[in-house]
Amino acid sequence: MNDLRVLYIGMLGEFSRRPLPALLAAGITVVGVCVPSAEKVPGIRQLEPVTAVSQLPILTPFAAPNLIHTAWEHHIPVWAIGRLGAEIAQLLRELTPDVACVACFDQRIPAKILATPRYGFLNVHPALLPDFRGPAPLFWTFRAGITETGVTVHFMDDGLDTGDIALQAPLSLPCRRSSCFSWRRSISSQ
């Protein structure tokens, strides 16, 4: 078991979900998962797993698992966070992660919060930085007709996707297919 303690922050989409099982498979201890709250108000609240079938919002075998389901399957606590403030800083101090990992989060994280974990924050960005910095990199990749792209893991700073690059992996998009579906298929096969 790896001694590294990670707080994972993401959205409910597939790109946010996929890195979590990879961290767990590597033996990394994930101390918690944070997702955005539906209400953009200050504060955080812990989400409890749904146990009764009658409480499930969707009863279909075709519903794809999301980041919350994946965390609960591995008994990892999940918090919904509103606007980032003192409460998330307090949660970081309580959980004592060595690093926070982010994949597709919809809020800019303040510098004071970025400095809380010992090794800072790492972001998984679905493009080869510095190209397509900022929100919606997949949209801009497809709009530009790019067929060679990749994934970047970088340290977060107070800029938007401007931190030092830790690693990059190239990825070819299928020829003549420039849709999110083809990206998801490509990334799923890796």
Place the predicted regions along the sequence by residue:
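One-carbon transfer enzymes
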Residues: 1-190
